[in-house]
Amino acid sequence: MSDDMSMGLPSSAGEHGVLRSMQEVAMSSQEASKMLRTYNIAWWGNNYYDVNELGHISVCPDPDVPEARVDLAQLVKTREAQGQRLPALFCFPQILQHRLRSINAAFKRARESYGYNGDYFLVYPIKVNQHRRVIESLIHSGEPLGLEAGSKAELMAVLAHAGMTRSVIVCNGYKDREYIRLALIGEKMGHKVYLVIEKMSEIAIVLDEAERLNVVPRLGVRARLASQGSGKWQSSGGEKSKFGLAATQVLQLVETLREAGRLDSLQLLHFHLGSQMANIRDIATGVRESARFYVELHKLGVNIQCFDVGGGLGVDYEGTRSQSDCSVNYGLNEYANNIIWAIGDACEENGLPHPTVITESGRAVTAHHTVLVSNIIGVERNEYTVPTAPVEDAPRALQSMWETWQEMHEPGTRRSLREWLHDSQMDLHDIHIGYSSGTFSLQERAWAEQLYLSMCHEVQKQLDPQNRAHRPIIDELQERMADKMYVNFSLFQSMPDAWGIDQLFPVLPLEGLDQVPERRAVLLDITCDSDGAIDHYIDGDGIATTMPMPEYDPENPPMLGFFMVGAYQEILGNMHNLFGDTEAVDVFVFPDGSVEVELSDEGDTVADMLQYVQLDPKTLLTQFRDQVKKTDLDAELQQQFLEEFEAGLYGYTYLEDENLLI
């Protein structure tokens, strides 16, 4: 369903009717620049996301058309006023198309620069995000594009869309007879379908079914390399990887095809180093090794025409431009240059033709295009007041804490900040133990905790972030003093990789970014699971365990954006606590400042989620009705309860109350 609508949303302060003096605008620009550095927006945002003069996140889906941008905070508020439920995914199909154009352009420049005569195709692996909006946005971009399938279901989706691309189809993954027949049917229909052999057991079935269908199969071979990347996804490449043939098996495959008279069917060489390759050196090493396979296969009489380097093109989630797990130390041009040069160099050295180069760059195409937006439903601040001095006969631990507090305010003291902090921590530890054994009262425990928070705040004020010796203490205190923000979303459903492999995603408020980030926060979801928390956040050039936050009204906190969740997250999300898919809207931004929004996914209802676990909503409603009727409640109240139960069954799985803040 869609609620296709056009909104003339403003893209600048002037169009909002907000008048500011030149001095105010200049000050906002300075603060915006500081926020860009704090959250590294300039790097992970990749010109798609920025901070405008109002201190709001703005989105420019096509950086080649900079006047086409939208204020995301204003867009969300407008949508809310029109009935949009949160959490919701705000998807920008124009970003998908720009990413595809950018990668294609990088390889075009590389081919021209190195005199490379072969073609290039980006083949989109739909496993990264199989949603129709993604596949069809890419197909309708006007750019050359192939599609990759890794299962029967994916192959059916690919074949159904193949008529719109007339390009390349690559078939990976485990294959049974039905999968293989589907691929061969696609070839018979006139599509260029490459069946990539990843297990020796597949080739006999391929040859058998090709004969049955009277079709010449178009085959590829996935070679298992010794080269391997590093990081969270390294196991998908290298000698121990799940897929691919070892060198001996590659030779066996060649001989099997030669004996069957089908050696000319083997036309594609495929390898995969791993997903999200952080270091360009690892990519270059792997391509050089795979180029040797290309050379050696030609020596064996195999006319390889396509060189599929697989995935690996990473994105900079951190914005640190480094080789850490969630970053990359290279850009699109360097990636394309390394691949084209390595393959071209091997061809020139051995007098071989330049093959068509294929990359399966799904993450790099899709990650940026989706933002999860949600509301904060509760804030727990570490508020404190400095307590008065303890009574004269108070236990020693209380007196010791008070003495440390007084010493912190005496001029000329020689004790270090760390020593003050450690002393107060030891005293508080003793008090907690004493409380458990009955030595300390509840009032005394509360007094000690308030004084400890006061001490932490006092130490925090005297620490210098530029002093490397202070960093461990700063991190410790930021964790201790951070606000707890309860956010209306499920980490397991919307960002499963943040939970499963500790992947970092950019998270920040959508507004208030023209202010100094004076507070720190940790974000907690609404699942009944202590793992439902985000553990790492962007903080300048590093990663922190708390999120920098500008000052905000705890009674009206800002909305939060979870960025770069367009790759894998929607597909991998699980049903923990029966929280379902969120609503999703597609946003189109035009140079005249107008915006069109289409509802692409209504989100799951409670009934939808119950049916997934074989709980029939109608049966549940009947069972609840039977219970209500057995009560001594009056008829009007019974009817009210039944209506509320039924409305809940067909309502959103997330919190919907207008007065949610707790």
From Swiss-Prot:
Substrate binds at F307, D308, V309, G310, G311, G312, L313, G314, V315, D316, Y317. It comes from Shigella flexneri. The keyword Metal-binding applies. The gene is speA. It comes from the Bacteria. The modification N6-(pyridoxal phosphate)lysine is found at K127. GO terms for molecular function: arginine decarboxylase activity; metal ion binding. Gene3D superfamilies: 1.10.287.3440, 1.20.58.930, Alanine racemase, Lyase, Ornithine Decarboxylase, Chain A, domain 1. This is Biosynthetic arginine decarboxylase. Pathway: Amine and polyamine biosynthesis; agmatine biosynthesis; agmatine from L-arginine: step 1/1.
